A protein has these predicted regions:
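Extracellular glycan-recognition/adhesion modules and their associated mucin-like linkers
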Residues: 2-32, 50-79, 97-105
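Surface-exposed turn/loop modules enriched in turn-prone residues
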Residues: 35-46, 82-91
Length: 105
């Protein structure tokens, strides 16, 4: 898989978001409700493990789940270490906006 600095994002494609251990982000138990947890899990080709990057303007992206159509969201709008990720219907809040930055390695 290409590094983030090598990937050109397309709003028409779905992507896996992989951790260094090879696990991917997914909606836990393919739950379609607001507040459903997002977790790391073994890749199995499921649509609840696939994500679409939606341009939010100003260099930010919303990350939408293929299966549920909901956005990756910071629980309770949290901004501190340890804040949980969950999914939520699209809002205008910054808790659903993400900036992507290339890494050096």
């Amino acid at each position: 898989m290409a590094k983030a600095s090598q990937v050109v994002l397309s709003e028409n494609e779905f992507y896996l978001i992989k951790a260094p251990n090879g696990k991917v982000l997914e909606v836990k138990n393919f739950n379609t409700e607001n507040g459903a947890a997002i977790r790391l899990w073994d890749y199995a080709g499921h649509p609840w493990q696939q994500w679409k990057f939606v341009d939010a303007g100003e260099g930010r992206w919303r990350i939408q789940n293929r299966f549920t159509g909901k956005m990756m969201d910071l629980a309770l709008g949290g901004v501190v270490e340890g804040t949980w990720l969950h999914q939520w219907g699209r809002t205008s809040g910054l808790s659903q906006c993400w900036a992507l930055e290339p890494t050096r390695n």
